[in-house]
């Protein structure tokens, strides 16, 4: 399958803006990407990695999120225990444990490799708590998004050939029968 770089980037910007808006993300928040470029290019997860598509996706997200002061973490595959690439500064500020691994095309994946190349001072961490994220190709990012996770129905449901889903988080509702709650939409006003 041939991927149109311009279209992919435009669609990714639209998807990301929808997540930022729905999740009411702000400066200092953390955004997680799970992605299999194999699925984007029409293959099977883990079997047809595309370094080029990984570069397009990660560079687009970094550019878009940096403008808003939102940090990116990129989930690797199960061959590196789904460790995440991120900036050392962010890992240290948030108190995440740094682990020792350098992602490779077939052990971490294209997007992890791209993030490691594009970040100023990349590190890998084992666990994070992100406010929201995008999952390109059904890689399962839920383990990295803060509770309570809210699935988001996107206007664009595929990127290339990959199914795309997204999550954002909201505070837990607590209290009894008299409690009232502010919705995400009310917070966005």
Curated annotation (Swiss-Prot):
It comes from the Bacteria. SUPFAM superfamilies: TTHA0583/YokD-like. Pfam families: DUF436. Belongs to the UPF0340 family. This is UPF0340 protein EF_1967. It comes from Enterococcus faecalis (strain ATCC 700802 / V583).
